[in-house]
Amino acid sequence: MSVFKKKDKSDDKKKKHDEETPQGTFQPASQSTSNTNLNSLASSVNNGASVGSTNGSTPNNSNGSTPTYNHNNSAEELEKQKKEEDEKRKKSELEAAAAVVAKKKEDEEKQRKEQVELERKRRDEEIRRTNAAAANAANKELNEQVEISSLEQMGKLDPSSTIHDMFSFFPNEVYNSYEKLQYFSRDLNTAVSHPEIVFVGPRSSGKSSLIEAFIGRALNIVGGGNIVGVGGSNANGCSKRVLYLQFTNNIDFEVPKVTIKKDNTIKEFDHDIIVSIEQLNENLAKRNQLTNDYIEEPIYVSIESRTTLNLTLIDSPGLLFDQSQAESNKIESIVSSLLRPSHRLIIAVESCSQDWKSMSMGQYLKKIDPELSRSTFVFTKFHHTVRGFSSTRDINKYLSGTVPDIKGFFVTLPNHQVRASYSEANRFQEKIYQAHKRDMHALEQLQYDKRYERTIGVAPLRRYILNIVWKSYQDTIPRILKHLRSKRQTAEATLNELQKQSSSLDSTKLRSIASNYTVTFLQITEKLLSGTSEGNPSANGQTLDEEKSQQGDCGEWVDAYKEAIYIDPEEWNIPYWSSKLYGGQQLERLMAEFKAVCDNSKISEVKMDDIATASGINKLNNIPNYAWAASDLTSLISRDTFVPLIEQLCERAMYIMKRLTDIADKVIDSRRKSRCIGSSPFGGNGLNNINSGGNNGININDRLSNTDMDSLDQYPFFTHHVKNLYYDFVHRAAKGCKEKCMDEFYSSRTIYWELTEHPDSSLPSIRNDHHETKTAVCQLATKLFDSIRQRITKNVLLKLYNFFLVPMQTDLWNEIQAQITCLSNEQLEQLFEVQATREQLKQEEKKQQQILEKYSQIDEQFLKAASLFCRPLSNPTPSA
């Protein structure tokens, strides 16, 4: 009994221990079981020991055999429990593994069933789509047959009918005359703008279908379903890009030549491609398959034909008024950029609706064309709307419900299946005619108001637009003719002028031209020296820095050692140093600059060697003459200092005078231009001033012949001869002035004589004290240098004025005029190159005569072509 009791106590302790162990503590299953068994065993042993000690008073238990037996029994039980728990653990692991395998098989089976179900649904969907496509094709075929049958009931197009497509709208004579007008405008370099027409409207409103109907050819740019097109229902069609159809008149192509221009956005199409009309749709589809979004880069298609006027039709992307805001805004931005140029005609295309309030294009266009002055409205799918009316009152009310004062047309176009089936030009035109006739038949049944007949159908719309195009070119004819006549008059005037020049090449006339030019040249030169703004100082004048930079090495002042002399014009008070001057004022500034340089010149250092050598021995008392030394040194230093400055002064003075020839030429050219525009530089009418002589105070230049002065460009040798005479005189005047200036440098003896008139007792008489000697001589030399500098500066400026500037204003006239007057007839002919000039004038006359004859022929041909082109055409204006 004690053994079982101990076991029960051990179990109680084990249970208590398990309850006290935290649940969050992680222990492996085997370890936990072993610990539990060991605890149970220890508990049993302790309990046994406790019982033994308690019953120790009993004699039967005093030998201690019972505790040994209980210990062995507990070990066996512990081992047994361990085995049982190991078996349970293995069994649970096997069960878990089996459960995982079963779960995996179950998932695989479920996935297989789902795949089977998806495959079945896919097959069902394919079958459904195939059936739907077949049904749709059958419905389309049925609708096409119904549409064709409905159109065929309207009868065939009469070959003699006046219904023409765009390529046969005008007679051949009109296209031929138009080609000639274009040729004349190019030959005359007169730009003629080509009309541009933009088709705009909501998506699926029929813009591109209307373009095809307007042209009268199935260009296959429209499609739906499996046919990719511009304006069809296919969202991947050309409607994502703007399409320019550029029609060009070219007499070389009887059959229209279609060229798709290079596409910079797609590398595959970076070159022009020539295609047939049948291949146009395929090529456009390829381009748009590579376009993922709406882009502003357009597609350009050139269509050249002998029977077309130059115009451009622009097909825009369809507007989306009820779609996402981002996409709609992008399309509106592209379309608005197309409509914004004010020279473009706008064709607003919109599907008909019995409720005018639901029409959206009117409000949209008013944002761009507020007065709707260049907008025309075309309402498509008119047949479906007409079938909804049952009374005359309702149909007339509908037709009169358009916005007042707008140009509107109602059209019905064959659907794309019919257009694809009848793409041949005549058959396509016939279907358009039948659709129009069907509309008119329905309107006749309703007894509509005949006033609206001119607004119904493609033919009135085509006539209306082409007449606008024709009238735009007709309006350019007077401008081209005016330009032609202006060129003809210019050619006649040039020819007359050449004939006058040729007849004037005699000695008397040449002498008159020579005298007139010489007088004009000398007079302008004198005015530029005296002071005048006629030479345009802002353009022809020079600042002090510009004057020096233009002269190069001679521009900067240098001393005797070729070192540049720094000048601060502002500090040295040089007048007008930053102003643009020429002539006399520029020479005055040069003289002021020369004076400033001289005034700031200092005597160079005097060395003792020079003093000792220059002093010498006085012949009277053998005492050194330091006054003589100072005079000699001052004479040498002043010559070395001022001679380079005088030479530079003369060089720059010659440069200023030589500049006057170019300025005089510009003044003469300015006066000639003033006469050409009917004015004179002296005021009033040029001819009146010239013929008025001196009675009104006009100087001699006013008596010059306009013809003589205007023809001076023909005689460059003579004008150069006059300028060379002027340059020679300037050189001689500058040379004489320089020689006069050199007289200012006195000899040492002259300076000494002047100095000894006022002897200075401060000069030392003993040569032993070198420092005192040098100081005294330097002071005297400096005093002498300052006196000489003042005298030279003053006298040089006076001589420059008297011997250089004054002769330019007096002797220049007499000398040059005398040399020109004394020229013999042979010399004049040589200077004027009479023989070469006559040959040149003959060639120019011949050339100008050919030009005049050409313009006369063009004038005659142009008038004939304009007469053929300006045939009377009806220009219907649709009623409101």
UniProtKB/Swiss-Prot annotation:
Which residues are in coiled coils?
69-152, 479-509, 824-861
Annotated GO biological processes are: actin filament organization; midbody abscission; mitotic cytokinesis; negative regulation of actin filament depolymerization; protein localization to cleavage furrow
| Summary of the function given for this chain in its UniProt record | Involved in cytokinesis. May hydrolyze GTP.
Per its UniProt record, what SMART domains does this chain match? DYNc (SM00053)
Under catalytic activity, the entry for this protein gives: GTP + H2O = GDP + phosphate + H(+)
Q: Which residues form the Dynamin-type G domain?
A: 191-478
Task: Give me the Gene Ontology terms describing cellular component.
Answer: cleavage furrow; cytoplasm; membrane; microtubule; midbody; phagocytic cup
Region labeled Disordered — which residues?
1-124, 532-551
Positions binding GTP in this chain are: 201-208, 315-319, 380-383
Region named G5 motif: 413-416
Subcellular location field: Cytoplasm; Cleavage furrow
**Where is region (G1 motif) located?**
201-208
Q: Where is the composition biased (Basic and acidic residues)?
A: 8-20, 77-94, 103-124
Composition bias, kind Polar residues: at what positions? 22-31, 532-543
- In terms of one coarse class, where is the protein primarily found? cytoplasm
- Note the InterPro entries from the entry: Dynamin, Dynamin_GTPase, Dynamin_N, G_DYNAMIN_dom, P-loop_NTPase
Give start-end positions of Low complexity composition bias: 32-68
Q: What is this protein called?
A: Dynamin-like protein A
Query: Which one Pfam family would you cite for this protein?
Result: Dynamin_N
Q: What is its EC number?
A: 3.6.5.5
The record's keywords, sorted A to Z, are: Cell cycle, Cell division, Coiled coil, Cytoplasm, GTP-binding, Hydrolase, Motor protein, Nucleotide-binding
The knockout outcome noted for this protein's gene is: Produced cells are larger and a large amount of them contains more than 2 nuclei.
**Entries under Gene3D superfamilies matching the protein:** P-loop containing nucleotide triphosphate hydrolases (3.40.50.300)
Q: Which GO terms describe its molecular function?
A: GTP binding; GTPase activity; microtubule binding
